[in-house]
């Protein structure tokens, strides 16, 4: 191995070791390690299952802690071994070992970047699960088809990230596609990853619904909000609620449309409307809809608190809640984020859920 490459390898390992130590401090490795021991001890107690919800909460906490503690432990150990081994390999001019260490360094870099990316999640709600509302804009069948394409895109994104996705509500379009849909996405930092997707998404293409092959522009809005838990206090006055039941619509099996199991809740003071139809049980649909309502009310409160700050920010930039954020020009093979200027030419890959380039750029720029 040439001398320059050797020097680069040594410099990389030294840099990675410094970054690993910085991450230990920033992510509070010692405290998380101690907490993990406590959580493991609690989960080993058979009595924990007398309270299934508490046990599930501890299980989720354990996974979150392990993701940090085990990754940093393995990273620190691997870097220490490689730093020691590289000195021996250099002394013996052992090129095979040096190349193996280079390969390990690539893995170290990937793990470091994953952990460093977590520093982008400053919102207290970032670690939570989330709901994604998709609403077709003006444009009839073309816009409704676009809404269904976005639904598929986010389901594919969740699959890529290892998140669990569930369609809670979908209202079919008049001819094709969807008028609206709501999906729940469960996974670590689901809201943190997806929150920058909120906004208006614009599609430009030759419409399959136009026999002349004309070029059409259509819009759909996306709204992402966190699923709040008991640690977030949200008060709902039952007197402010109007609860309606109706028969579920959309794709379904033999039980679909047999009973009024779907639930719609309207919160009079805010005008917020939520609906859920994914379960055959009206009781479970009602509970899920209430959770959605509380989550939307929490997000509304957070946005109200930030109104003045947003006014200042909006005076500096053209990025706001209701502004267009991304343009999908399919016949020119171009998808561009209008906030970060990230542009992708492989449109099908994006529509198949590869949103990471857009999301990472948005988080890094603090969108």
UniProtKB/Swiss-Prot annotation:
Keyword hit for Repeat: no
UniProt modified residues of type N5-methylglutamine: 254
GO biological process: viral translational frameshifting
Entry keyword set: Cytoplasm, Methylation, Protein biosynthesis
Post-translational modifications reported in the UniProt record: Methylated by PrmC. Methylation increases the termination efficiency of RF2.
GO CC, alphabetical: cytoplasm
UniProt main location, coarse: cytoplasm
Domain of life the protein comes from: Bacteria
Cross-referenced Pfam families: PCRF (PF03462), RF-1 (PF00472)
Gene3D superfamilies in the cross-refs: 3.30.160.20, 3.30.70.1660, Release factor (1.20.58.410)
Localization, UniProt: Cytoplasm
Entry GO MF terms: translation release factor activity, codon specific
Family statement: Belongs to the prokaryotic/mitochondrial release factor family.
Function field: Peptide chain release factor 2 directs the termination of translation in response to the peptide chain termination codons UGA and UAA.
Note: The gene for this protein contains a UGA in-frame termination codon after Leu-27; a naturally occurring frameshift enables complete translation of RF-2. This provides a mechanism for the protein to regulate its own production.
NCBIfam families documented for this protein: prfB
Annotated protein name in UniProt: Peptide chain release factor 2
Gene (UniProt): prfB
